[in-house]
Amino acid sequence: MTQSSHINRRFVLAKRPQGMPTREDIVLKEEDVPQPGKGQMLLRTLYLSLDPYMRGRMDDAESYSAPLEIGDVIVGGTVCRVEKSEHPDYQQGDLVLAYSGWQDYALSDGEGLQKLDADMSHPSYALGLLGMPGFTGYMGLTDIGNPQKGETVVVAAASGAVGSVVGQVAKIRGARIVGIAGGEDKCRYVTETLKFDACVDHKAADFAEQLKKACPQGIDVYFENVGGAVFDAVLPLLNSKARVPVCGVISQYNGQNSAFSEDRLPLLMGKILKKRLRVQGFIIFQDYGDRYPEFFKQMSQWLGEGKIQFREDIVDGLENAVEAFRGLLSGKNFGKLIVKVAG
């Protein structure tokens, strides 16, 4: 079913997932398109970003953001067109970056919106390279990782939206960059297109040994966004005073048991102490929101100079969002996962 001018399709949380989300957990509802009142505007969704953090918002465990309530629209960044406006600062046709979630239409009073250039050649980049994923990779690497020329930087999910930015920015800064990805095609893309120095397939039976060979001088910066067995292989290779920015642990988002259970926590703490590691988590807009303009200017410059490559994995149709999201959580996407909701 394509987007209608009369019906608003909304994916809502019907119940909290146990493991991988299903269509019983996330259900499609249809309502009349709402009409804007004074000071409001009607946003029409063009592109929807799918990101791993959304899975955490479906649980009711304590976290850095409040959980979704049952019946809430699934959260998500969006690029929208202003369809109707009763707001003094926005006109019909304006292009905006919003967080209106998994739905065709939404009302907004302008809070949290960011205007985009109406003639932007790749509006979806506002959800990827120039949006939250790119911002996450840039700030985590440069502020916490702070790679120096000649150091070895390792990043998992290297072909993805965050990892690809981490590696390319590290190369610009003169570091040696080793990626970790799943499968030969992704590893080939990482080395041939993104120009990483090496890439290791985490699906390989001898993954840990391959990673060790790819990092003969050890690891100075490990950008953590996966966790689990990948971190197990990285930990012994970390050099003294290595930095570990932590932006996510996608391997744990569906509730799998962590490789570092409570009885192994002393091992991790011992490594942190003996090697004087800096392990720091961060929540991008909470910790670095005021530096977004700095990031946007720099990344736009690099993009214009051809120094940054970025791949999108675009799925057509809001109705396909659930299956696409499931694929994201199991590593099936290749690049920044975007749902094209309308043209």
How would you label these PLM feature ranges?
Residues 2-3, 15-46:
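A short N-terminal beta-strand-loop micro-motif at the entrance of redox/enzyme domains
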Residues 103-104, 182-190, 207, 264-269:
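Short, glycine/polar-rich helix-capping loops at beta-to-alpha or helix-loop-helix junctions
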Residues 74-81, 89-157, 199:
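NAD(P)H dinucleotide-binding glycine-rich loop of Rossmann-like/cofactor-binding domains
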Residues 127-205:
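Mid-domain Rossmann-like dinucleotide-binding core that forms the NAD(H)/NADP(H) cofactor-binding site
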Residues 229-308, 340-343:
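Glycine-rich phosphate-binding loop and adjacent beta-alpha segment
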Residues 206-216:
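Short amphipathic alpha-helix with an adjacent loop that forms part of the alpha/beta core around
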Residues 33-50, 58-102:
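Glycine-rich beta-strand-centered segment in the early N-terminal region that forms part
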Residues 2-6, 286-343:
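C-terminal hydrophobic helical "lid"/dimerization subdomain
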